[in-house]
């Protein structure tokens, strides 16, 4: 009888330990999920600020159509989730592997915190910059901004000298500070919570964690792809009506900048090098019998008015 009671106690203890281990991984997933939701809320905030600050007059058939306008925010959530899943993938894989190894170190959570803060800070800077960019060019920020990098001092003077840019800059900085504080607090809280439930791991636990993690990673990859069709999500998926502002409002600026940069670097869109550039210039100067004008063009010529 004592042996049976001892066996039952060992079984109950083992079940509790296995439940704790599963709970550890569940807490890790909850930690990532909360950060994911917080980031989506910030992306929504940037879109709402753009919507309310833009000086745009809707057509009469759309001006009072709340459902039509709200659809842009739903589309925006779709695109925001794609970017958030890109950022989520690496931390998810890391916590999955550490859970399989039953390894929960402080440096892991510290690295994940820095990773989230770094990439979401960059995303928020782009989202904040998109507000004045859209106001001036009436299009979502794209790879054309790289053209301004060659004029650093001029660009900085334009940004800092324009008072209308101060609010987006302030919004971006506040968002970064709030997200950084939230991520650090969540990381510290869940690290201590997970380590308070430390226990050994069994093959069954590893199998459960492996299956759960694989499903979550699969869902994250699907979130990155954005749709079930043959092609992954594209900017054109945001277009749903005849209004140009609403069609562009749903596009995440980080997504648009990323995809436009990748498109620029495609083989068919690269700069053509049919022959050495200097050789081509020399040939054209010889054919046109021009020496060019320095600072203007290698084939420019001076035209003087007849007296």
Where are these regions (language model features)?
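Transmembrane and membrane-interface helices of multi-pass
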Residues: 15, 21-267
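Detector for methionine-enriched segments
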Residues: 1, 8, 68, 158, ...
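Membrane/wall-proximal cationic-aromatic binding patches
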Residues: 165, 250-307
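Short, intrinsically disordered terminal tails adjacent to the first/last structured region
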Residues: 1-18
């Amino acid at each position: 009888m004592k042996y049976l009671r001892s066996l039952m106690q060992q079984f109950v203890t083992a079940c509790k330990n296995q439940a704790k281990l599963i709970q550890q991984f569940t807490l890790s997933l909850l930690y990532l999920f909360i950060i994911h939701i917080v980031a989506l809320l910030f992306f929504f905030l940037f879109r709402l600020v753009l919507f309310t600050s833009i000086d745009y007059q809707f057509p009469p058939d759309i001006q009072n159509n709340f459902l039509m306008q709200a659809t842009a925010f739903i589309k925006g959530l779709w695109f925001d989730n794609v970017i958030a899943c890109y950022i989520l993938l690496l931390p998810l894989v890391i916590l999955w592997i550490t859970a399989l190894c039953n390894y929960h170190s402080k440096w892991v959570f510290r690295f994940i915190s820095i990773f989230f803060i770094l990439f979401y800070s960059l995303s928020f800077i782009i989202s904040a910059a998109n507000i004045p960019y859209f106001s001036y060019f009436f299009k979502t920020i794209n790879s054309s901004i790289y053209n301004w990098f060659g004029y650093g001092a001029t660009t900085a003077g334009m940004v800092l000298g324009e008072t209308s840019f101060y609010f987006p800059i302030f919004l971006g900085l506040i968002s970064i500070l709030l997200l950084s504080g939230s991520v650090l607090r969540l990381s510290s809280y869940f690290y201590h919570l997970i380590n308070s439930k430390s226990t050994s791991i069994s093959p069954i636990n590893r199998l459960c964690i492996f299956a759960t993690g694989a499903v979550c990673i699969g869902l994250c990859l699907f979130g990155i792809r954005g749709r079930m069709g043959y092609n992954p999500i594209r900017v054109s998926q945001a277009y749903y009506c005849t209004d140009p502002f609403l069609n562009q409002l749903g596009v995440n600026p980080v997504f648009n900048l990323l995809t436009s940069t990748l498109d620029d670097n495609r083989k068919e869109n690269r700069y053509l090098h049919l022959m050495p550039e200097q050789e081509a210039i020399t040939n054209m100067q010889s054919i046109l019998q021009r020496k060019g004008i320095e600072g203007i063009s290698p084939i420019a010529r001076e035209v003087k008015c007849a007296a």
